[in-house]
Design a protein with these regions (language model features):
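Alpha-helix initiation/capping motif
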Residues: 13, 17, 95, 99, ...
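Residue-level detector of family-conserved "landmark" positions at structurally sensitive sites
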Residues: 42, 123, 176-177, 230
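Conserved small/polar residues in nucleotide/adenosyl-binding loops
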Residues: 1-5
């Protein structure tokens, strides 16, 4: 049974074999054998650091398979997001270990957010550099992100609320919060890509919070909306107003 699944899910999918290194493909094989997923379809999104595939669970539900690329050099630049986080004090040397820890960090961040009732993509499993996630969309087509949608004042308030909930409930700062990693659905905004999120004890957490607020405020201003002064938003979130 697994041989057929592996053949269907990988051998016919040249993209997987071309994009992913052998250890990553073997990790996905292991996940299939463990019945975490049963089939891998095409690429949903490809970036410098990761490739996201549309996959199918053993229950025939759509899921997202996020694979962090071991070969990329950009992870070395992101080491500061981990080294200052008290939750990850011991970092083994080497890019591969850093990427594995990054995947684990994203899984842990998402799990914390779910536990706090924050609308984020639900994590299903993590193994090495492969993260299995809830699929936000239908029939292999993901929901549109904020940058792809018309936005309004409600979206702005919801985005700021996400930053506030991360800070006050999960004690996290996203660190890379933007219109590119927020899905707009009929039920509201859903946040994803939380690998960069840091604990409030991280030495750069407040600067990252300020940057997150500025970035998303700038987006809504470009879309013609009036936004609250980012400094006031920052102080409110920090409870200084």
């Amino acid at each position: 049974m697994y041989k057929r699944q592996l053949y269907d899910g990988f051998k016919k999918n040249k993209t997987i074999n071309e994009v992913l290194d052998k250890p990553t493909v073997l990790t996905i094989y292991e996940m299939i054998k463990s019945q975490i997923l049963s089939y891998v379809n095409g690429v949903i999104r490809a970036g410098k650091e990761s490739v996201v595939f549309w996959a199918v669970s053993p229950d025939n539900d759509d899921i997202a398979l996020k694979t962090y690329l071991i070969s990329t050099s950009s992870f070395k630049k992101r080491a500061s997001y981990i080294s200052g986080d008290p939750r990850f004090s011991r970092i083994k040397s080497g890019t591969r270990n850093l990427v594995y820890l990054w995947a684990k960090k994203e899984y842990q961040n998402l799990t914390s957010c779910i536990g706090c009732g924050i609308p984020v993509v639900k994590p299903i499993a993590v193994r090495k550099n492969v993260l299995v996630l809830e699929f936000i969309g239908k029939n292999g087509v993901p929901e549109k992100t904020l940058v792809e949608c018309q936005v309004n004042k409600k979206d702005y308030k919801s985005a700021i609320l996400l930053i506030e909930q991360l800070y006050k409930k999960a004690h996290l700062v996203h660190g890379d919060f933007s219109e590119y990693n927020i899905f707009k659905t009929k039920n509201g905004l859903i946040l994803f890509d939380l690998g960069s999120a840091v604990d409030l004890q991280h030495p750069n957490s407040q600067e990252l919070l300020k940057r997150d607020i500025n970035n998303i405020s700038r987006f809504f201003v470009k879309r013609g909306l009036t936004v609250e002064n980012p400094i006031d938003v920052l102080k409110k979130i920090q409870n200084e107003l």
